[in-house]
């Protein structure tokens, strides 16, 4: 029977730690972008044409803030998936310790 185990216990633990940090960090960034934090304006991808060509420029910037916030939440969800895979690897490593071959 093939095993789903593809990494060792240290790498799996490292994956869990990085996933937890990534979820916390990206969730906070997503919240701050959704709240349209002025400090993060440098990270919003807009050009001068976006401001000049529109009659209501703040709405374009607010839409870009929301889009970046959604991207952060999507990345946090990917980190949740990586954390779940790492947790499965930790459990498989622990089970392999108890198996006698």
Swiss-Prot record:
Single GO MF annotation: RNA endonuclease activity
Keywords for the protein's UniProt record, in alphabetical order: Endonuclease, Hydrolase, Membrane, Nuclease, Transmembrane, Transmembrane helix
Family: Belongs to the RNase K family.
Cellular location(s): Membrane
Protein name per the record: Ribonuclease kappa-B
InterPro entries (alphabetical): Ribonucl_Kappa, RNase_K
Secreted is among the record's keywords: no
Principal subcellular localisation of the protein: membrane
Annotated Pfam families: V-ATPase_su_f
Bilayer topology annotation: Multi-pass membrane protein
């Amino acid at each position: 029977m093939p095993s789903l185990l593809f990494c060792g216990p240290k790498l799996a633990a490292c994956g869990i730690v990085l996933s937890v940090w990534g979820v916390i960090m990206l969730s906070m960034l997503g919240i701050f972008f959704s709240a349209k934090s002025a400090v993060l304006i440098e990270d919003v991808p807009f050009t001068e044409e976006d401001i000049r060509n529109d009659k209501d420029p703040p709405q374009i910037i607010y839409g870009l803030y929301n889009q970046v916030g959604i991207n952060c939440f999507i990345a946090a969800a990917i980190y949740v998936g990586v954390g779940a895979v790492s947790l499965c690897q930790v459990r498989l490593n622990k089970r392999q310790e108890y198996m006698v071959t």
